[in-house]
Design a protein with these regions (language model features):
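Negatively charged, low-complexity tracts enriched in Asp/Glu with abundant Ser/Thr
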Residues: 4-54
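Short, charged/polar surface micro-motifs in flexible loops or helix N-caps
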Residues: 51-54, 61-66
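Short, surface-exposed beta-strand/loop "edge" segments at domain boundaries and coil↔beta transitions
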Residues: 63-68, 91-95
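Mixed-charge, glycine-accented linear interaction segment located at domain edges/termini
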Residues: 84-105
Length: 105
């Protein structure tokens, strides 16, 4: 019987952990969501946590494309800001480093 040792693991090649919204960020987003639901504008939401981006999608109805997407991309922290609000057509409505100001679209 022969034993094979696994090749060394290069930490730089390890997949990065997924990006997620932190509790204070979700509190801001859900506060806005609650106000818009009460106004009858929004009805549903979805959250996606991927490797490079976390997305909070807002829907008018469950079975349609999102009206808005609130994205968090930490790699853009030093450049354009890691938060962005994107419209239904894919246009970036607002981008910045502070989520509270970005949500004032």
């Amino acid at each position: 019987m022969t034993l094979h040792t696994p090749p060394p693991v290069n930490l730089r090649e390890m997949p990065s952990p997924q990006v997620a919204f932190q509790r204070p960020e979700l509190a801001l987003i859900l506060s806005l969501y609650g106000r818009m639901v009460a106004a009858g504008e929004w009805r549903d939401y979805g959250i996606s946590c991927l490797r490079e981006v976390a997305v909070f999608s807002v829907f008018r109805r469950t079975a349609e494309h999102p009206m808005y997407r609130i994205e968090k991309r930490p790699k853009l922290r030093g450049k354009q800001g890691m938060y962005a609000v994107i419209g239904m057509d894919g246009q970036i409505l607002r981008r910045g480093a502070d989520l509270k100001t970005v949500l004032r679209v």
